[in-house]
UniProtKB/Swiss-Prot annotation:
Belongs to the helicase family. Poxviruses subfamily. This is Transcript termination protein A18. A motif (DESH box) lies at residues 204-207. Residues 98-254 form the Helicase ATP-binding domain. It is found in: Virion. One of its GO terms (biological process) is transcription initiation at RNA polymerase II promoter. Interacts with G2. Might be part of a transcription complex composed at least of G2, A18, and H5. Its EC number is 3.6.4.-. Disulfide bonds: none annotated. CDD domains: SF2_C. It is an enzyme of class 3 (hydrolase).
Length: 478
């Protein structure tokens, strides 16, 4: 259970530093309310808050971790890279220190996309040898985790048919590791069971949850706090530190050669009846999240042609080999799929459509192919798509926040035999009404890629053979 207490001014100040403008917690009556300074009410402070040495303990927090896995001698320890071993060592040292100081064993693993958070976590589970729950935001990540848990030879159960069926199955067949989706936590009976019977809780892609909202995960961490808890993310939300306040971020020296190619082109102004109708909604509430900006961009015929020409040229010249193309809209995705499958055929071009029930089979297939083009949306590919062999990324959309950008770029930052990674962006549009907006958001992608993730801008002078760039240079010199 969380720590029920009044919040004095000093603690309130610390909490506001983490939460920002508004701080919401459950009060002692179970209401999720905003906390104000000098309140006389009592609130439930998540135990994970006290995992940081900067927060004074209200009382010692001791947990008995006695839910050992069966057949612990059969566990296979995974092989880690040196930089992953460094993280695992630091985490285990932190856990040991927390036990000594009677603080909660909560750690956020803030590790870059492609670092290997899944295998590193499996190593930690192998060391703990305690029963664990792995909580995922969606089913798309299940296969990735299932393969990883199978590799360490621990008895596990994957829940795909709902929490009710899982509870029935656990009566017949106990499991050392459960792989679930987060909506299972809306079931109180299930929460009580894992609180009692499981010691470790892993919240994968923790940035997907805003724990300042009254969500199932927020309630679970408040009322059924795990004994050992790991948050995994490449792009942490600061507010979530209230629930897991010790962050380990070990930078690794990557030997990947990462480049970002900026394909600039000065278009003649283009429009159509469809575009003109959508332009009317640009400065209205309909475009609050830039949905119409992206819809208009998807209708940009000259820009779409430039993207296609660039992809075809680079793929035929083997400049890119294992390529992922991402769009914001499904319609835009289908446009590129239709054109590219006509050019290269179904043995090369694959569709990453979340609506396709066989999508996991497609992802599995491309992992074994030497050259392919995989076309998907930012929604499907942004988090959890695990194809380590990807070496190139074409971004057709523009409007993304920093977290989304880093997640998308992370699709090609995983370790594989190939060491070169290329991102291709298109900062120009032929539609004058969104010209500056597209330029602004594309520059945001470029800046984050270079300054935070270590990509290098390709010198345009060294790429005059490339069709799209060559056309752009010719236009500029006329």
């Amino acid at each position: 259970m969380s720590v029920c207490t009044e919040i004095d001014y000093k603690l309130y100040t610390e909490l506001r530093k983490i939460a920002g403008n508004s701080l919401f917690l459950f009060n002692e009556d179970g209401d999720f309310v905003e906390v104000v300074s000098n309140s006389s009410f009592k609130f439930l402070l998540p135990v994970g808050l006290f995992s940081s040495m900067d927060i004074p303990l209200k009382k010692p927090i001791e947990c008995n971790t006695d839910n050992d896995i069966e057949h612990s001698k059969n566990v296979v320890m995974p092989n880690l890279y040196p930089f992953q071993e460094r993280v695992a060592s630091e985490v285990l040292s932190s856990i040991k220190k927390k036990v000594e100081l009677k603080r909660p064993m909560y750690v956020t693993l803030h590790l870059a996309c492609g670092f290997g958070k899944t295998i590193t976590t499996c190593y930690l589970l192998s060391v703990h040898k305690k029963k664990a729950v792995i909580c995922l935001p969606n089913k798309m990540l299940i296969n990735q985790w299932k393969r990883a848990i199978e590799s360490i030879n621990i008895n596990h159960l994957v829940s795909v048919d709902g929490v009710g069926n899982l509870l029935k199955e656990l009566v017949k067949k106990p499991a050392d590791i459960l792989i679930i989706v987060s909506r299972h936590l809306s079931n109180k009976e299930f929460c009580k069971k894992i609180h009692v019977d499981y010691d470790v809780f892993v919240l994968d892609e923790s940035h997907m949850y805003n724990l300042m909202n009254n969500s199932t995960v927020t309630r679970f961490l408040t009322y059924y706090p795990p004994k050992i808890c790991y948050f995994l993310t490449a792009t942490p939300r600061r507010v979530n530190r209230i629930y897991c306040n010790d962050v380990i971020n070990v930078s690794n020296s990557s030997d990947l050669k990462k480049y970002i190619k900026i394909v600039e082109f000065f278009f003649e102004t283009y429009s159509s009846d469809t575009i003109r109708q959508m332009v009317k909604k640009l400065n209205t509430n309909y475009n609050k999240y830039h949905m119409y900006t992206e819809k208009i961009l998807a209708e940009d015929v000259p820009r779409n042609k430039l993207i296609l020409d660039t992809i075809i040229y680079d793929f035929e010249k083997m400049i890119v080999n294992r390529l992922i193309i991402v769009t914001k809209l499904r319609k835009h995705m289908m446009f590129f799929y239709t054109n590219l499958i006509e050019k290269f055929g179904s043995d090369i071009v694959y569709l990453g459509d979340a609506k396709n029930k066989n999508i996991s089979d497609i992802v599995k297939k491309i992992k074994s192919i030497n050259r392919f083009i995989f076309i998907s949306t930012t929604n499907y590919s942004g988090t959890g798509l695990d194809v380590p062999t990807l070496d190139s990324l074409v971004i057709c959309s523009a409007v993304m926040n920093s977290m989304q950008i880093e997640q998308i770029l992370g699709r090609i930052c995983r370790y594989s035999i190939s060491k070169t990674r290329t991102v291709i962006v298109f900062p120009n549009t032929s539609i004058k009404e969104i010209k500056h907006m597209i330029g602004f958001f594309t520059q945001k992608i470029i800046t984050l890629a270079i300054e935070k993730l270590g990509f290098k801008k390709i010198d345009k002078k060294g790429n005059k053979q490339e069709f799209a760039l060559c056309k752009a240079f010719n236009l500029q010199t006329r």
